[in-house]
């Protein structure tokens, strides 16, 4: 592109939101420090068969704000066209521009996140010592989290589930990520075992959306 910028180059950030990991076992293995296994055609076929047998919920695809390479180059070196004319030399500003571009792609992906019920359930339950909450407390936390997202959106491309808190809990139970323990004083909802570890993926995907509100809350607490 630098030597012959005939057509515009655009980087399109894309956020893909899941409700259940297809390669959950691989994710657990990587978290435990095991090396990533090489994928084979037979492994892919086996995985495809298993996917068809299970319910993995919905997948959401959001498109972030596109990034134009021309704009990045102009910001890094306003006279870049004149500088590169007739030379093959590397330029000191190029490496820094590539780093800035990579960062901006990640930022724009985060600004297009989708927040589904599994994300909110994971964020609420995994924040407790035993990954469990009284149902009424969980309902209140889910409603609060959703209200924060709707009142102070991280960006205009952020999408948030339309489910209310009771529907989120019911959906989490249907997806097999939330367990209910009956109790006369109020049911307890929890994430257990490997399920809780897997849900860290969904929690981590939306934590950045609450960072500003969390810092403000921390200031008041201290």
Label every PLM stretch briefly.
Residues 1-222:
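Membrane-interfacial terminal anchoring regions of lipid-handling membrane enzymes
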């Amino acid at each position: 592109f630098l030597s012959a910028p005939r057509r515009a180059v655009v980087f399109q950030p894309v956020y893909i939101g899941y409700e259940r990991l297809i390669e959950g076992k691989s994710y657990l293995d990587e978290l435990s420090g095991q090396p990533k296994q090489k994928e084979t055609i037979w492994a892919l076929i086996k995985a495809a068969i298993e996917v068809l047998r299970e319910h993995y919920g919905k997948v959401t695809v959001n498109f972030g704000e596109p990034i134009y390479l021309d704009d990045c180059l102009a910001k890094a070196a306003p006279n870049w066209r004149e500088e590169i004319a007739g030379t093959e030399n590397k330029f000191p500003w190029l490496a820094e521009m590539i780093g800035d571009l990579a960062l901006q792609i990640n930022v724009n992906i985060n600004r297009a996140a989708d927040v589904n019920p599994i994300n909110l359930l994971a964020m609420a339950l995994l924040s407790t010592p035993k990954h469990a909450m009284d149902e009424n407390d969980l309902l209140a936390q889910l409603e609060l989290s959703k209200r924060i997202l709707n009142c102070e959106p991280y960006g205009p491309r952020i999408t948030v589930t339309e489910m209310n808190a009771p529907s989120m809990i019911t959906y989490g139970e249907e997806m097999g990520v939330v367990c209910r323990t009956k109790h006369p004083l109020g049911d307890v909802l929890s994430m257990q075992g490997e399920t809780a570890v897997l849900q860290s993926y969904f929690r981590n995907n939306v934590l950045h959306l609450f960072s500003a509100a969390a810092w403000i809350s921390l200031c008041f607490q201290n």
